[in-house]
Swiss-Prot record:
This is Paired box protein Pax-8. It is found in: Nucleus. The modification Phosphoserine is found at residue 305. It comes from Canis lupus familiaris (Dog). Residues 159-223 are annotated as: Disordered. Residues 12-68 are annotated as: PAI subdomain. One of its GO terms (molecular function) is DNA-binding transcription factor activity. Thought to encode a transcription factor. It may have a role in kidney cell differentiation. May play a regulatory role in mammalian development. Residues 9-135 bind DNA. Residues 87-135 are annotated as: RED subdomain.
């Protein structure tokens, strides 16, 4: 066989006994014989034994033949022959312009069908795609676009150069502000250089937009500054924060006006703040023990510990004639009375959920306060309007102001009728309610309900 003759060069015998020359392809005759045996149906392993060619060489030759149809060897250690000739590139461009959706493998088949290329010179699918991408479909040329872009840009808008080059400033940007500033975008003229605020070097590095960090000292450059506000703009922004919208209700050592921490909030929020201060006297008692009279809250107290009411009367006397309308400047202080009140062996009635029925009100004299309803006023729901009896009379402000000491309070028990024994006429004085017996039936009460006048007499 021709390939058995060892030519000059490095050669030898393979594992099958066949001769080969190192770095040289198989002869053309052996390649054709391999392809012919494969067409006859001989397996690659049998072809390798018959021709004494390595199995890898047979597989490589057959694989290339099935893929490209060529049996020529590839070039080792050099460049392949150029298949993308100008004629082939022009044809590929014509095919793509005629049918833009044409695939690369269809272009390859058409090149072979029209005889533009043969099996050895036809470009591969990847080569055709590369030719279409780089040479056929070129939307723009970089040099031309750079020239057009440079011409279309205004003098104030230039392309960003490399980091080593600083873009020059134009005269228009000096008069209308920096290109990247709000004043420059809105066309607002900036004030003179004497009113500009200056920053130190550390703030300039963090707050400016600059391409070149090593700027030259040829002239001042404009940067985007986050704090570039004039005093004219800062004053209206800071005014709302200087006003105190929420006055402090608790006194603290840092108060510049210490008297404001001891007055009730409604007086501080009123328009006539100065007039209210003139009628009030600051109290040294902690605020937790001071309550203004119009802020009425039910007091739940232990029935075993009597309390005394001490009223701090201001310099200006109240003009009210009823206990329910105390002066807003008065403060009530509840203090526990020790030793005076209920005796040790006396029986104390059970605790009632309603404040006016608790025994704590039994420690008050009848002339001072009648019941809890006198403190909270007649406007609360569930309380009838107060009709004083003949023994009670009317109460002047002096009677309330001159409270007796805690040791002189009467220790008599609370002798009024409990709330649960009042009838429907007491709880429903208004006839406009929707059918009061519908909610509270009178069948469960054997005694007849008292009249309105009788119910009020119990008070």
């Amino acid at each position: 066989m021709p390939h058995n003759s060892i030519r000059s060069g490095h050669g030898g015998l393979n594992q099958l006994g066949g001769a080969f020359v190192n770095g040289r392809p198989l002869p053309e005759v052996v390649r054709q014989r391999i392809v012919d045996l494969a067409h006859q149906g001989v397996r690659p392993c049998d072809i390798s034994r018959q021709l004494r060619v390595s199995h890898g060489c047979v597989s490589k030759i057959l694989g290339r033949y099935y893929e490209t149809g060529s049996i020529r060897p590839g070039v080792i250690g050099g460049s392949k022959p150029k298949v993308a000739t100008p004629k082939v590139v022009e044809k590929i461009g014509d095919y793509k312009r005629q049918n833009p959706t044409m695939f690369a493998w269809e272009i390859r088949d058409r090149l072979l069908a029209e005889g533009v290329c043969d099996n050895d010179t036809v470009p591969s699918v990847s080569s055709i795609n590369r030719i279409i991408r780089t040479k056929v479909q070129q939307p723009f040329n970089l040099p031309m676009d750079s020239c057009v872009a440079t011409k279309s840009l205004s003098p104030g808008h230039t392309l960003i150069p490399s980091s080593a080059v600083t873009p020059p400033e134009s005269p228009q940007s000096d008069s209308l502000g920096s290109t990247y500033s709000i004043n420059g975008l809105l066309g607002i003229a900036q004030p003179g250089s004497d009113s500009k605020r200056k920053m130190d070097d550390s703030d300039q590095d963090s707050c400016r937009l600059s391409i070149d960090s090593q700027s030259s000292s040829s002239g001042p450059r404009k940067h985007l500054r986050t704090d570039a506000f004039s005093q004219h703009h800062l004053e209206p922004l800071e005014c709302p924060f200087e006003r105190q919208h929420y006055p402090e209700a608790y006194a603290s050592p840092s108060h510049t006006k210490g008297e404001q921490g001891l007055y009730p909030l409604p007086l501080l929020n009123s328009a006539a703040l100065d007039d209210g201060k003139a009628t009030l006297t600051p109290s040294n008692t902690p605020l937790g023990r001071n309550l203004s009279t119009h802020q009425t809250y039910p007091v739940v107290a232990d029935p075993h510990s009597p309390f005394a009411i001490k009223q701090e009367t201001p310099e200006v006397s109240s003009s009210s004639s009823t206990p329910s309308s105390l002066s807003s400047s008065a403060f009530l202080d509840l203090q526990q009375v020790g030793g005076a009140g209920v005796p040790a062996g006396a029986s104390v009635p059970p605790f009632n959920a309603f404040p006016h029925a608790a025994s704590v009100y039994g420690q008050f004299t009848g002339q001072a306060l009648l019941s809890g309803r006198e403190m909270v006023g007649p406007t609360l729901p569930g309380y009838p309007p107060h009709i004083p009896t003949s023994g009670q009379g009317s109460y002047a402000s002096s009677a309330i102001a001159g409270m007796v000491a805690g040791s002189e309070y009467s220790g008599n028990a609370y002798g009024h009728t409990p709330y649960s024994s009042y009838g429907e006429a007491w709880r429903f004085p208004n006839s406009s309610l929707l059918s009061s017996p519908y909610y509270y039936s009178s069948t469960s009460r054997p005694s007849a309900p008292p009249t309105t006048a009788t119910a009020f007499d119990h008070l």
